[in-house]
Every structure is written in structure tokens, then in C-alpha cells.
Amino acid sequence: MSIKAVVFDVGETLVDETESWGDWADWLGVPRLTFFATLGSVIARGGDHREVFPILRPGIDLAAESRARQAAGRRAAVTIDDFYPDALVCLRALVEAGFVVGIAGNQPSETESVLASLDVPLALVASSERWGIHKPDPAFFAKIVTELGFEPAEIAYVGDRVDNDVKPAARAGLRAIFIRRGPWAFIQAGRDDPPAADSSIDSLDELPAALANLS
């Protein structure tokens, strides 16, 4: 069955999250290296990324701290400047090639306005906060299928995480494409291709060829 639609994760797939995490480190008054190393240790033991906050600041109320940051004018979501250089080029190339293209990830609802402002005709722009469903919940991928109206095998899902992207997408019947970049990708899979992935790439420049090989 040929692939008709391609849906992308956000963080470390399309967007470089270095500045987002770095801004949190600055807000907490923690050296960025310390924050990043602690985050890496949480990822390595299979923990949730939010666990980094009580490690660095015991007793933190993360929701309250997030509201305080927003009130202070700090970033609440990704920005256009955070996109990897290959991201928009890839999105436009896929649309021009005739693919239906969407973006859906574990993100705050504010991210949707940034994604919707891209100069790319996207068929789907969705955040976990708006849907009320978070990856790796199978319902997240079922929602993608319902929204696009294709068979699961006609949809490719591109993501950097083995646990949140590759495995659940494959279990849902989508074609899972693993992009090897960002801390989750290298810590979870190293240089070996995840067994559940239909294809693995090192940059989005390689995606069109990967899709052609799967069709």
C-alpha cells in the first residue's frame, strides 16, 4: 500500500529544542550544562522529561512555575527560529510531491498557532493538549488516522523517539520513520536502527528517498 500522507512529530524532529530547554535552565538559575546532563540521565533511565525539574529544584510546582514564566514574557512554545534548517524545505517538498502533510505531537496548544503560521499547506496541525491525548497512547495515532481519512498503512509518522513515536506508530499500523537526532534518539537507539522502524534517517533531507523506498 503506497504512502499518501506524512505526519511529523515536533520536538527534535522539526524543531531544535536546545533553546527551549536552555531557557528553562536560565529561569531556574541552573547552568545549561547541568540541566542538559540531568535531562540526559532522566532519558537514559526511561523517565519522563518532567522529572528533571524536581531533581534540580525539589518541591517545584511545575504548573505554577510555567504560568510564572509566561507572565514574565518567557517563551511558552517553540518559535519559527527554532526549526531545523531542513524542516521547512522538507515539508514544502513533500507537499509539492503530492503528499498530504500534517504535524501532530506532544505539545502545548500554543504551538499550534506557530505551526499554522508556516508557509506550508498543512492538512493537520494538532497538539496533545488540544486533543487531550498524549503519545504513546494508541488513541493519539488513531486520532491521526481519523483526521486524515486514510488507511493506517497509507500514513507515515516521522519522529525522533523510539518510545513515543516509532513503537506506538508501528503498533497502530502506520509506517514508522525514525529520525536519528536529538537526545532521545541517540540515547534510546544509539547508532542502531530501532527494530520497529520501517525506515531510519539522519536528516529530513533523506526523507523523500526513504518514502520512495517504502512505496
Regions picked out by a protein language model, each given a short descriptive name:
Residues 1-99, 108-112:
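N-terminal helical cap/lid subdomain that shapes the substrate entry/recognition surface
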Residues 1-7, 63, 88-215:
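Asp-based, Mg2+/Mn2+-dependent phosphohydrolase catalytic module
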